């Protein structure tokens, strides 16, 4: 996993150059933005259980055929695995928000996940729907202006949304 700082240093080192003013300014912007990132991660972490549980309940209501007798996720172990996987994905989304980078999510969570679901007979589009439900809840929680660092968070919210979109696309 390379964070933004490591990437900039690595790129400068490959060129055998000092950091440019543009690179330093970009890193200063990241530092200024870090409190907002920490606020978002803290909120998502504090609300992780409800985000996952509510997404799962909404998914069951939306796609009962997947969870009813005869469905691919009928058995309680499969249902527990669904909840667990949604939680894993949310956790890796928070890592991505903190790092400003998807490499850890890609490497440790998403790579091979679609194939795993296919092998288990789990409909990837159902998992993607659950991820989208988590995205909606996470954005609502993260966008609440009370008790967080002031300032424009639109770019960060767009970034947060993109991490959920990436996860949903990886399993669909």
Curated annotation (Swiss-Prot):
Keyword Thylakoid: yes
Segments forming a coiled coil: none
Keywords: Antenna complex, Bile pigment, Chromophore, Electron transport, Membrane, Photosynthesis, Phycobilisome, Thylakoid, Transport
UniProt modification remark: Contains two covalently linked bilin chromophores.
Main location: membrane
Localization per record: Cellular thylakoid membrane
Membrane-related topology note: Peripheral membrane protein
Subunit structure: Heterodimer of an alpha and a beta chain.
Family as reported in the entry's similarity comment: Belongs to the phycobiliprotein family.
Protein name listed in UniProt: Phycoerythrocyanin beta chain
């Amino acid at each position: 996993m390379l964070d933004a700082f490591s990437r900039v240093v690595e790129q400068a080192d490959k060129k055998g150059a000092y950091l440019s003013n543009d690179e330093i300014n970009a890193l200063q912007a990241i530092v200024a933005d870090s409190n907002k990132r920490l606020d978002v991660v803290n909120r998502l972490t504090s609300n992780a259980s409800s985000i996952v549980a509510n997404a799962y309940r909404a998914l069951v209501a939306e796609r009962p055929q997947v969870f009813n007798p005869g469905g691919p996720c009928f058995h309680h172990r499969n249902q527990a695995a669904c909840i667990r996987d949604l939680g894993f994905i949310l956790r890796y989304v928070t890592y991505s928000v903190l790092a400003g980078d998807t490499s850890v999510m890609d490497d440790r969570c998403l790579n091979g996940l679609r194939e795993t679901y296919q092998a288990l007979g789990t409909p990837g589009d159902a998992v993607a729907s659950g991820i989208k439900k988590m995205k909606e809840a996470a954005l609502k929680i993260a966008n609440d202006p009370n008790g967080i660092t002031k300032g424009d968070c639109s770019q960060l919210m767009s970034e947060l949304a993109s991490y959920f979109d990436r996860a949903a696309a990886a399993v669909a």
